[in-house]
């Protein structure tokens, strides 16, 4: 967990403690957020490209959308 930022570690602790809801379809959750980031014209092109690249890699390597 040390390699992740403070906000991620905080949310992790909240989910683990039951204070924040757990999402069983974690890959779907990640892809939804990455898609939202990649499509958001208010964000920098660099951030959008990073999100698109991460989502595409996830789709190629791990995820099957049925």
Curated annotation (Swiss-Prot):
It comes from the Bacteria. InterPro entries: UPF0253. Pfam families: UPF0253. HAMAP family: UPF0253. Belongs to the UPF0253 family. This is UPF0253 protein CKO_03176. It comes from Citrobacter koseri (strain ATCC BAA-895 / CDC 4225-83 / SGSC4696). The lineage of its organism: Bacteria, Pseudomonadati, Pseudomonadota, Gammaproteobacteria, Enterobacterales.
């Amino acid at each position: 967990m040390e390699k992740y930022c403070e906000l991620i570690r905080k949310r992790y602790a909240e989910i683990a403690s039951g204070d924040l809801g757990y999402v069983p379809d974690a890959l779907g959750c990640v892809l939804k957020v990455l898609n939202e980031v990649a499509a958001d014209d208010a964000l920098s092109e660099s951030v959008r490209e990073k999100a698109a690249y991460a989502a595409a890699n996830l789709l190629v390597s791990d995820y099957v959308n049925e």
